Amino acid sequence: MTTEAMETTTGKVLWRSTYVTDYVDSFGFDNGPRAVPAVADGRVFTYGPEGRVTALDLNTGRELWSYDTASALASPQGFFGRAPSPLVQGGRVIIAAGGSREGQDAGLVALEATTGKPAWTAVPDEAGYASPVAVGDHQILAWMRNRLWLVSAADGRILSSQPLRSRMDASVNAATPLPCGQGRWLVSAGYGVGAHLFRLEEGKIHPLWQRADLLDCHYATPVMVGWQIYGFHGRQETGMTLRCISPEGSIRWEAKEKLDGGTLIAVGSKLLILTEDGELRLLNATPEAQDLIATWQILRAGHRSHAAYASGIFYARDSEHLVAIRLR
């Protein structure tokens, strides 16, 4: 697996860090990586599909330490390899490994950011594909294979949990929990799970509502703009539609066109959508109706890598190309 640092304006490679992995996707898709790197305090933290966590120096790419969740925690590969992105909080790197360590639960593991040494392990659950998220400075919310967990960031102590998964074994939880204001969090998946809204209060997870037909996000995490939620509804195999819903659980609008899937980014009052067919779509985020401004074909079809946006530049890649587009 290779991690590269590039100049934003030219694409010039500043450094490259590579390690050898024998990971092969069980279903014949690309061999990763899946997880988005985390950057904090002069370090870059990566999590490879084979289970290796690596810390790199941000300026040079020099490897500082690595930790193998497969050997240390018996972290299983799952359907598509390890995919949750690292979370850096309180000087530690939180990984949804879904394993166990010397008889102890290790669904989550916290590694010291400076050394890679385990600080704590917790949660008796397998990993899904959603990434753990910070709730303030002291708590972590993690949607795993079987349950939604709220734990203490200091020691991994379980504060609260809720059962939340499909009845189908061949299912995935991929969309990361979305904060919706006032302590509310939206969690969504396909395979009959649908949309669930929870309130986190005093260290507890309180269910507010659940609707199976409102928004079932197969892969992409939805976004929130102006107190409205925008996301893809439906399975990738049968086609997805873009929907706008309210945090109260009503559908504001649904696009007529079906897509194979894609990812969403909110920038101000705009939505940037990259479809699996390699098309970039720019929309106004409005609850009245879908308001498509423009489309551009920027990549070849057949990819699922999440796009990124920073300082006016939109970044996207497929298996062969990385493109940077300045948006005005």
Where are these regions (language model features)?
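Noncatalytic, solvent-exposed loop/strand surfaces
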Residues: M1-R328
